[in-house]
């Protein structure tokens, strides 16, 4: 794979991550900062960015997110139906499924 293709994919991932992070933060900042592994002040800073600033920020050769695989979650996903870790409107107020 060419370096320019890799750079393009990294930038695409970065902008997708920033957009998702901002949507999560706008919905529930406390839950989002925990799920994203960022501080409250970083969450607030991300919320102040407009789309143009997000695109500029994404234009780097560095990943803006860290991917962390959780063995328990992956094992649960492999063993059964889809596991939802974030509360959806349909499941609001219901307990989250246990991870064995």
UniProtKB/Swiss-Prot annotation:
User: Pfam families, per this entry?
Assistant: FlhD (PF05247)
Question: Has UniProt tagged this entry with the keyword DNA-binding?
Answer: yes
**One CC-aspect GO term:** cytoplasm
Q: Where is the signal peptide?
A: none
Tell me, what is an example of a GO biological process annotation in this record?
bacterial-type flagellum assembly
Q: Name one GO molecular function term.
A: DNA binding
Predominantly, its location class is cytoplasm
Q: List locations, semicolon-separated.
A: Cytoplasm
What InterPro entries does UniProt report for this protein, alphabetically? Flagellar_FlhD (IPR023559), FlhD_sf (IPR036194)
Q: Which UniProt keywords apply?
A: Activator, Bacterial flagellum biogenesis, Cytoplasm, Disulfide bond, DNA-binding, Plasmid, Transcription, Transcription regulation
The UniProt subunit note reads as follows: Homodimer; disulfide-linked. Forms a heterohexamer composed of two FlhC and four FlhD subunits. Each FlhC binds a FlhD dimer, forming a heterotrimer, and a hexamer assembles by dimerization of two heterotrimers.
Domain characteristics, as noted in the entry:
The C-terminal region contains a putative helix-turn-helix (HTH) motif, suggesting that this region may bind DNA.
Please give the function described in this protein's UniProt entry. Answer: Functions in complex with FlhC as a master transcriptional regulator that regulates transcription of several flagellar and non-flagellar operons by binding to their promoter region. Activates expression of class 2 flagellar genes, including fliA, which is a flagellum-specific sigma factor that turns on the class 3 genes. Also regulates genes whose products function in a variety of physiological pathways.
What protein family is recorded? Answer: Belongs to the FlhD family.
Protein name listed in UniProt: Flagellar transcriptional regulator FlhD
Q: Which gene encodes it?
A: flhD
